[in-house]
């Protein structure tokens, strides 16, 4: 019998992505905003999709976070982030000269805990960065209320949450800044890409400022003349990524619906108490379970042809960020978590197989 090979992540593509790539390739204009103008098109479509006031396409989720944090207080201070995240969530704070303050998560959701935010916040706090872990949306109402009471912005890390909703509004339309990541493993797949949506009252000013920073700080371009008024970076999205993104965005709701159906099957079928909750507002970038003897279980699943993950090693446990923090729920989750595939290429037989194998092992 042929051994199964079930991937943890796998983008779903069709002729639309191939057609768009060919259009860009044949145009010979592959840089942002040139040739077939897929970057401009993607920007407009994604802003409309999220319901945001404005938005800017960039070349990674890390770039999106960096640009967002670069526009908070120029007075150096502290930014509160969860440690249970990819390192970019913390890196972006240091890039802008601020100090990272790690907050714990709610062990029932994996999302940042508003109660712990209240404990960590101070007069030095300049922003809060909640992460929608696995696509499960944080308690934005509580976080927003905390931020407003301290007159600081919320910068959502929505790297896992393209297409997710909160109170029936899409993620991207709620906070001051919302940062997305697009990658072959993400819900909206691209070779590489990112996006910032902006919902502040001064969104027009911030959009223009970030667009300047996205291209090395260049502004006031007239013909071949331009000015540079502040530091910037080369964070443009390229036309190839945007071409794929336009095709992916047109079917994102359908792709996420498939992920939700897969997550529902895990939630109903797995004989575990500690598992990711089910809600139709989640985009389910992955599905997580918490187990003892994680490595042994992962190895058994690997031998059965099932790829799994461990999202994430806590940032405060890495050498660079090594700090004596007491973050018990984060450390418990990171020690026990196994992430399972939810991607739309999974068949019903694949899901049944994964569920059966896990139930046999546990």
Language model features with spans:
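Phosphate-binding glycine-rich loop
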Residues: 32-78, 84, 92-96, 102-104, ...
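Helix C-cap/helix->beta junction micro-motif
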Residues: 96, 149-150, 304
């Amino acid at each position: 019998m042929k051994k199964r090979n079930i991937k943890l992540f796998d983008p779903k593509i069709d002729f639309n992505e191939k057609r768009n790539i060919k259009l860009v390739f044949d145009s010979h204009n592959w840089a942002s905003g040139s040739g077939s103008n897929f970057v401009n098109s993607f920007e407009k479509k994604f802003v409309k999709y999220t319901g945001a006031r404005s938005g800017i396409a960039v070349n990674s989720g890390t770039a999106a976070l960096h640009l967002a944090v670069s526009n908070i207080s120029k007075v150096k201070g502290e930014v509160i982030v969860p440690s249970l995240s990819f390192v970019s969530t913390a890196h972006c704070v240091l890039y802008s000269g601020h100090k990272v303050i790690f907050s714990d998560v709610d062990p029932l959701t994996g999302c940042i805990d508003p109660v712990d935010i209240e404990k960590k916040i101070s007069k030095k706090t300049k922003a809060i960065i909640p992460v929608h872990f696995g696509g499960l949306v944080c308690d934005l109402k509580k976080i927003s209320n905390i931020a407003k009471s301290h007159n600081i912005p919320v910068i959502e890390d929505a790297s896992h949450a393209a297409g997710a909703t909160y109170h029936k509004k899409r993620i991207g339309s709620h906070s001051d800044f919302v940062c997305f990541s697009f990658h072959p493993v993400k819900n909206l797949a691209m070779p590489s890409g990112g996006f910032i949506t902006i919902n502040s009252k001064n969104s027009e000013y911030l959009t223009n400022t970030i667009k300047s920073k996205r291209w090395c700080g260049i502004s006031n371009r007239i013909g071949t003349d331009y000015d540079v008024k502040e530091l910037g970076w080369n964070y443009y999205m390229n036309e190839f990524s945007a071409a794929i993104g336009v095709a992916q965005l047109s079917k994102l709701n359908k792709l996420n619906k498939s992920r939700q159906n897969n997550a529902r099957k895990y939630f109903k079928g797995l004989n575990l108490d500690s598992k990711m909750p089910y809600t139709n507002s989640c985009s389910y970038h992955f599905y997580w379970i918490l187990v003892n003897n994680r490595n042994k279980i992962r190895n058994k699943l690997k031998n059965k042809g099932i790829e799994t993950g461990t999202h994430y090693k806590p940032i405060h446990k890495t050498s660079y960020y090594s700090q004596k923090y007491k973050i018990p729920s984060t450390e418990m989750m990171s020690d026990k978590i196994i992430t399972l595939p939810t991607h739309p290429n999974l068949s019903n037989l694949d899901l049944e197989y994964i569920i059966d194998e896990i139930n046999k092992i546990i």
